[in-house]
Amino acid sequence: MKPAPDLSPFNGTVIRLKESPLISAERFPPESIPGLPADALANINGPSVLRMPDWAPGKQSALHLYFGHHKGDSIRLAFSDRLEGPWKMWTDPILPLAESLFLSTDPSPDPSIPEPDWVDALDGDYLYAHVASPDVHIDEAHQRLVMYYHGLLPGGDQQTRLATSTDGINFKPREPLLGPPYFRATKLDGMIYLSMWEGRLGRTRSWEGPIDLAPKELLPDDITGAPDRQIRHGHVFAHQGRLHLTFSRIGDAPERLLYCELKPAEAWSDW
């Protein structure tokens, strides 16, 4: 990747709507929602908010918010006509862990299986069955919703799968494994671009893949913070012919959101 000092900066404004999260235990006491674990709203990562199309028969309000606990057993749904709320909770999971095609119970350590290369960054806390980080998009061409989500594999690796829905309520998972966890997608000039765990980037022309993964070293150290830091959670969006990446890093204290712009090219080396 080459620096491009001639790129004009993106001038935008980020407005925090409220002091408290849209989804929290204070707003939705767990005991008021059947089957919701006590801590289900305490550790949410990677929610998706989208304006629902009129063709979706499961549309509850103008906005659907899909979310899950970072170590949770389901993907959930809240809905509202306004971003500021009030939000209501759909009582049933839209994708339970048991139906996710990932491990549904915590595995025991197996010395014969090598640990994933990212385990050191998590202090060994990784053998927990979960389904998390839904990234939901509208596929107008096929009148469906597509959702990237991740879970645990035997041996401790975490990977991403795709689930689809024609109503916005019932999602059907697909078997193929697409790549690392924490997919975030955006479309630009007919291509779907992806950010993932550790700041990995990818691209595909179909929601189902296959995914063309960028080299791990694509992002320079002054962005990733290597070797002392590591990109953890990122989000990518397209605007004015460029990709805009926001992310946090393991090792930053205090933890913060960072931002960079990317100008895509056909060859990864020309980015």
What are these regions (language model features)?
Residues 1-133, 137-232, 238-271:
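Beta-rich carbohydrate-recognition and catalytic domains
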